[in-house]
Amino acid sequence: MAVKRLIETFVPENYKIFLDIDRKTKKIKGQVAITGEAKDSVIAFHAKGLHFSKVRAFSVDTNFIENEEDEEIVVKIGETGRVTVSFEYEAELTDNMMGIYPSYYEVNGEKKMLIGTQFESHFARQAFPSIDEPEAKATFDLSVKFDEEEGDIIVSNMPELLNINGIHVFERTVKMSSYLLAFVFGELQFKKGKTKSGVEVGAFATKDHSEAALDFPLDIAIRSIEFYEDYYKTPYPLPHSWHIALPDFSAGAMENWGCITYREVCMLVDPENATIQSKQYVATVIAHELAHQWFGDLVTMQWWDDLWLNESFANNMEYVCMDALEPSWNVWESFSISEANMALNRDATDGVQSVHVEVTHPDEIGTLFDPAIVYAKGSRLMVMLRKWLGDEDFAAGLALYFKRHQYGNTVGDNLWDALAEVSGKDVAAFMHSWVNQPGYPVVTAEVIDDTLVLSQKQFFVGEGADKGRLWNVPLNTNWSGLPDLLSSEKVEIPGFAALKAKNDGKALFLNDANMAHYIIDYKGQLLTDLLSEVETLENVTKFQILQDRKLLAKAGVISYADVVNILPAFTNEESYLVNTGLSQLISELELFVDEDSETEKAFQSLVGKLFAKNYARLGWDKVAGESAGDESLRGIVLSKTLYAENADAKAKASQIFAAHKENLAGIPADIRPIVLNNEIKTTNSAELVKTYRETYVKTSLQEFKRELEGAVALIKDEKVIAELLESFKNADIVKPQDIAFSWFYLLRNDFSQDAAWAWEKANWAFLEEKLGGDMSYDKFVIYPGNTFKTADKLAEYKAFFEPKLENQGLKRSIEMAIKQITARVALIDSQKADVDKSIKEISEKL
């Protein structure tokens, strides 16, 4: 049932909010006055978990009804027109990382509490009565009183105006949506700087971190704001930009306007021992949130079905920004590895959501934050659009969009209109097929009787209903003489031999630089030509060959055995991008390999041979002046070499562990997870798991914490695994925000999978209580769908989750997971024998 829009009866203009918060009792006392235009004599405001004692309108007490089911308070004001409605109420701090909530941490063994907020998507209503809809933009006058202690500070969207007897009064905000209001208070350390245009920028964290951990995020934030101001040709709209790392946080980060909050691992960087991947990740997260300060905050989607306007765009711009600020990082390679790969895999399952999807009820909003679709696919579409328009027109169109719609709300067509006005191209016609349709096409390229035939149809992994969908496919080819777009089902280009000669006899390839959202099935001579030139192709094209052949095999269009046969062509590659493509393919092939089998021995040998040259070249030690690509590649090479049971690598890993056993965090970060994993695999020691766990609890280094959790999950000891699982219910050991990651590490390992699955089923009520509404909640649906590969597990999954299909927040994820497991089981059954044979044959030949 569609939820009613409260803005239809009341349009807010200003909120005056006073909150009195006590950390010890976890109680909130609130007084809120909302001024706006009443369009009805009976109006409603969103409210959840708020206990009202008084409501006034037109300066007199008025009747009200609390409707818990619809999360509303209904107020009878008796007339229409401009009115101020005031509320007095009490509430409690939440413990599920939504609304106003506490974060817990320790400094030198002393337990402390920080208070922060998370109001996106519709959780402002848990803090104050509001029209909690993105279209209902208003200004906010915020005042906060709290049980202040020495060393405490408070920050919010706007600068603090004054402090009256412990009441912190903040300047009025600009006009914005309720979900962007934010504040944080507690004992925080910080560093500040300024942009060239005078915007004050600050990085904040608790004092259990090194102060130097703030340097990198502060530098990235300052430079990113400067980049966006220039690129958008639109000034940053606020006087400051605060960046706050919270010990407990449900998402990765949140773009609160001027007061951005982060999970600690997404913002803080160990200045003495951080990987290049960690720096890149933190930098792109910061750039993503800052992109939102314009696209999402200054201009906001009208309703949640256009969430992609926020997230797809910001996900694209984080890479545009970082490519400009740190060109040596080659971040577009990372885009292909992560975003493109994630989108292509998820978007190939029948039933997947489109980028733009109708939202009828707030319970469905959480399902929109599918990172593979709204973020990854959406950003891939923006990359495609930027290439089609050209960067100059793309940037100019954005500047026009911001100028035209600042402090307002939009739908997707408003963006297309601005880009079309600048470029002269019909952007809406080009983009509608991509944004409004689920899935993507496979373009088949073949030569028939000297005619090049290019055709498109929707690509499915597993069963899929072909509904005849067509896309405007940019061919982006390396040849001249071909059309720019494939918009029909098929196009035929005669005279292939002559056309090839005009293009110097080069092999034909499509989708140059992997910038458009489709894959290619090259048939016959076209594939042979590509593979014969593989050493001279661009790295991204080599990666695409591996990417596309892997997906075609996953769909059963070709066999994984065919893919194994092309692996020898990639043994001499030094590129991080290409070797990551190999690594991803190897992970897929592991599905067919039984533990302790002859095939496993042959596969280990094959993997070792594929990475032998890079192992000899890179070794274990970072070299001064080496490229970001080599630094990133080392971990992949070492991991695969150890998988291959390389005696030299295993001995070296053990030596490094022994040299650092008194300070595990001191292992060089780029090899640390490999060393930690190897020691558990080698010793299978329960005592070592205990050491890792004790280290996990004590350290404040979030990247190191994840590495330790990944390592302990490799233990093959049922008693220890049971203890690990039980510890997830102890927040002093594993924070609720980290349960999903820690649990998945156990689920993905064959030895511990049954125990992890049993724990999930037995503790579903606990997960609902702790994580219901949290952005990691549906991971407990999705992760098994990404992992299970047997008919028995499929039956168990259906038995447990099909009764939960009535939950709108989980429905699509459950249906998708069932299809994914079904397809995986069928794939293994149909291809295993051929894949085993090919692995053995190629391993012997290589």
Curated annotation (Swiss-Prot):
Chief localisation class: cytoplasm
GO cellular component, one term: extracellular space
One biological process term in Gene Ontology: peptide catabolic process
The keyword Amino-acid biosynthesis is assigned to this record: no
Residues that coordinate or bind Zn(2+): H288, H292, E311
Active site: E289
Family, per entry: Belongs to the peptidase M1 family.
Name of this chain's protein: Aminopeptidase N
Organism encoding this protein: Lactococcus lactis subsp. lactis (strain IL1403) (Streptococcus lactis)
